[in-house]
Amino acid sequence: MEKFRVHGPFTLSGTVDISGAKNAALPILFAAVLATEPVTLTNVPDLKDVDTTFKILRKLGVVVERDESGAVQIDASKIDHYVAPYELVKTMRASIWALAPLVARFHEGQVSLPGGCTIGARPVDMHISGLEKMGSVIELDEGYVKATSNGRLHGARIYMDKVSVGATLSVMMAATLAEGTTTIENAAREPEIVDTALFLNAMGAKISGAGTDTITIEGVERLTGCQHRIVADRIETGTFLVAAAVSGGKITCRGTKADTLEAVIEKLREAGMEVTVTEDTITLDSKGQRPKAVNIRTMPHPGFPTDMQAQFTLLNVVAEGISRITETIFENRFMHIPELNRMGAKGEIEGNTAICHGVEKLKSAEVMATDLRASISLVLAGCIASGETIVDRIYHIDRGYEHIEDKLRGIGAKIERFSTKFEE
């Protein structure tokens, strides 16, 4: 099993080129199944979850190729298989996005119930009910969700009982080829939904309202080829800004957009950090100052993103003062706190709230990553702790951060990957 060995404390400073967003790349890759012609995607991050998506697409009969420049060509014109199998789907919850494009274009699709990070309940019910309202028949059989339709799906008014990024994307994809108009109310507003809509429209879809809570899709008969650049990863951006804030450094994130990260930037400024933005850069200068504690409440976009909660937990455990962090999106998403406490942090969990008592310094320890965002907070903790920290189960990080140790070394971290022969 691979681990990271991280030495500290070090100040993290420099410039980081931000990768394409995993949370846009995955739905866009699955949405390419809707097209009868090849599509070309650029700025696709080199990640485990992207590789898994390639494997699922190839199982369906899609031709997927990545060239030397990193551009990805996808040709879904000869799909001959409609099942996303358990052995691939089990590692990644995003696999559910294979279902809507298959049933929309081919009137049948089958996806194993998905896996991924262990952070509480993420039911697929809203994906399923959306497809049912559009005329699909859904069966659950031996761990698989099977969707069929008698001809084209039909447009429908779909109200989301809970704001759901995943279900909004599923319904939006399916509706592009449906007969008639579909309206999604109480839709998620994340930038990755906007990017997916831009991609679908480039293929000939008729989507309006993405980025608001009401999305309207007029169905078309077919979608064609296009070229599209994946939006920058706002969570990777926020992660590196926090790296500067907790280490007393100054970091510029290049190739990113501040308007996708307003809630995070506001909280960093509240923590006493100087943040400056240009059209495609964000710079955080801590001026060597310890951050001030900030209260956080995770919310759907444009609120504070749940995927930045673990990083701000780290900020708060080394900040001046006491803070409360309330997690409203996912259950069981404070598993990093006991690990940070092993490093000398003072964090308490009360239901869906964490209380952080800031300490001046962390000390090294052997810690275990539990999910994607928790794992990066432990790596950053290792960068600012005295001594050698070992971070176990780093496969979580490879699912969502491209070339992370290279990027961290580029801003002054001392980090290496190593393997152990036996899993304890």
UniProtKB/Swiss-Prot annotation:
Its main location: cytoplasm. GO terms for biological process: cell division; cell wall organization; peptidoglycan biosynthetic process; regulation of cell shape; UDP-N-acetylgalactosamine biosynthetic process. UDP-N-acetyl-alpha-D-glucosamine binds at R93, K162, V163, S164, V165, D307, I329. It is an enzyme of class 2 (transferase). SUPFAM superfamilies: EPT/RTPC-like (SSF55205). Keywords: Cell cycle, Cell division, Cell shape, Cell wall biogenesis/degradation, Cytoplasm, Peptidoglycan synthesis, Pyruvate, Transferase. Pathway: Cell wall biogenesis; peptidoglycan biosynthesis. The modification 2-(S-cysteinyl)pyruvic acid O-phosphothioketal is found at C117. Phosphoenolpyruvate binds at K22, N23. Its EC number is 2.5.1.7. It is found in: Cytoplasm. Belongs to the EPSP synthase family. MurA subfamily. Cell wall formation. Adds enolpyruvyl to UDP-N-acetylglucosamine. This is UDP-N-acetylglucosamine 1-carboxyvinyltransferase. It comes from Actinobacillus pleuropneumoniae serotype 3 (strain JL03). The gene is murA.
